[in-house]
Design a protein with these regions (language model features):
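The AdoMet/dcAdoMet-binding core of the Class I SAM-like
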Residues: 2-123, 160
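SAM/dcSAM-binding transferase cores
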Residues: 2-6, 12, 161-195
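Generic structural marker for isolated residues within well-ordered, non-membrane alpha-helices
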Residues: 32, 141, 184
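A generic structural signal for alpha->beta connector loops
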Residues: 41-43, 66-68, 123, 149-151, ...
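Short secondary-structure transition/capping segments
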Residues: 50, 65-73, 125, 145, ...
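A short, terminal or domain-edge coil/loop segment
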Residues: 74-83, 101-105, 109, 148-150, ...
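C-terminal substrate-binding/active-site "lid" region of AdoMet-derived donor-dependent transferases
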Residues: 104, 110-174
Length: 195
């Protein structure tokens, strides 16, 4: 599991037993494989815009769809917008959506961040990976802060310089923050993570 995947999994400190996780971006599948393995009672939905990435699913040993895993070919921003009127809100929204030009255009829009906030419940966690080469990382963090409010926690990842940004209602709950601090070392050891 690569460094930024480990950092993105820090959502477990704020939402240790998510019922539903929505992932925008499949990539090489490290996030979905980790969640599928370590969170067996969690329903995972992954939305990937590039059919060629989905076609490599078997090559990257990403498990097949089943009752708790579904990979959908589509635009993540549109999928999130469609969830606004749904009862199937995710507890956690993990965003790692890039194309050859950087962050996917529809994901970079302020409307996506606003819709993301609307689909997360009172216990929700929003996590976004911003690649090191993304020139507008500061702009993205400020957009997230404007929509979600403080705290927004940007964490620089290892030598590559990626930034993982955490936001959402769960981060404002003082009891959750205290519990997160107490549970961090236990979760790190159990899942071989580095928070």
């Amino acid at each position: 599991v690569n460094d930024y995947t480990r950092k993105m999994m820090a959502f477990l400190l704020f939402c240790p037993e998510p019922r539903r996780i929505l992932m925008i971006g499949l990539g090489g599948g490290s996030l979905v494989k980790f969640c599928n393995r370590h969170l067996p009672s969690t329903h995972l939905t992954v939305v990937e815009i590039d059919a060629n990435v989905i076609a490599l699913r078997a090559h990257f040993q990403i498990p097949p769809d089943g009752t708790d895993l579904r990979v959908i070919h589509g635009d993540g921003a549109r999928y999130v917008a469609a969830l606004i009127d749904s009862a199937e809100y995710p507890d956690v929204l993990l965003v790692d959506a890039y194309d050859r030009d950087g962050i996917s255009r529809s994901i970079a829009e302020p409307e996506f961040i606003e819709n993301s906030r609307r689909i997360l419940g009172d216990d929700g966690v929003f996590v976004m990976n911003l690649a090191a080469h993304e020139a507008d990382s500061t702009l993205h963090v400020e957009r997230i802060r404007k929509v979600f409010g403080d705290p927004v926690i940007p964490v620089t990842v290892g030598w590559g310089g990626n930034m993982v940004v955490f936001a959402g209602p769960a981060l404002r709950d003082r009891r959750r923050l205290e519990a997160a601090q107490e549970n961090a070392r236990r979760v790190e050891r159990a899942l071989d993570l580095d928070f």
